[in-house]
Amino acid sequence: MRFLPLVVVLAACASPAAQTPPPAPQSPRESTITSASPSPSPTRTGPLRTLTVSGSGDILIHPSLWGHAQADGGAGGPSFVQELAGAQPLIKPADYAVCHVEQGFNNPAGPVTEYPNYYTHPALATGIAKVGFDTCSTASNWTFLKGLEGIGRTNDALRQAGVSPAGSRTKPRQDLLAVDEVNGIVVAHISATDPADSPAVPDAPWAINRATADGLIDQAVKARDDGAEIVILSLAMGQMGSSAPTAAQRKTVSKIAKSGAVNLIIGHGSHTIQGAEKIDGVWVIWQGNLLTSFFPDQPRMHEGLVSTVTLAEQPDGGFVATKARGDIVLSLPQSGRLAVAGHQSCDQVTAREQEAYAATAEVMEPAIEQGFKLTKPC
């Protein structure tokens, strides 16, 4: 859904470790947070509002997917629209759709590269926008590769496409978060990556949001103090290929969720679906991948969730999650397309979709017991 971006609403958010001493005294809007307690919400007098949020996993363009984008775009230049289009019916209906750009953008003439460099073409931003994404997290363990130039190129391309970037910046006083007004609701999107697994940009440690749990709570509190009614956190963290969150992941998200500062945590980083958990009313959903072309013998890395969470306003003005649903999406490297594991007729369900559902249902079982709805293939 398209929305009204709030160009100047919040002061820059950064973890204490990511900030450098300012050359002059800070203004009140830039002062350091001293309390991690969210401000009380005012009592709501008008009709109670709702917001549906779509969250999905990593977009990581390998050379084979780049080849499909070149073929799809033809003489008009590379296009990623067709590669992402399979998930559009899940993304477009949401009020606010969140994606994760795992790699930075190279210049248009530069190569799309494989591990360990991982750059992609800025045309990806257009594809992201056209399938319905409103904001993208950009903080990951690959953000630093092209330095400030690459961060600027990535964020500029997303903004030009109408997508709000979050998680990285080229100047220390710029915002690290995205702030948008959606259906009259002010939404802040914070993106961060695990500092233990994500190198800082040389000479610019403030460029990527590498905050700890305490730092992220402070950022969320600051966002609320500056007017955000809903705060969404995208967190890149986890062990690659693991089907379960690590102890560090669990500790981090538990502390953040219990703080009451955020409404939803969208996790990615392991490249596999790792389940979900509702902690003190806050859903934490580890999404897996959206679009990628990983190892052929690793089917779990070609699966992801597109989750839809309904946040409903309460009489006190706060928002709580009342519904959560996940749809399984398969990345098909050979065709360069996405397939949703959901059909009107069971005769249409493929063996691959049945396998993906069985594996995902096992991982999601605790979340299903908490009320999470996993869409069946038919």
Spans of model-derived segments:
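Acidic, metal/ion-coordinating pockets
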Residues: P22-C378
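Sec-dependent signal peptide recognition
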Residues: M1-V7
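C-terminal motif of bacterial Sec signal peptides marking the signal peptidase cleavage site
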Residues: L10-A12
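Bacterial signal peptide processing site
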Residues: A14-A17
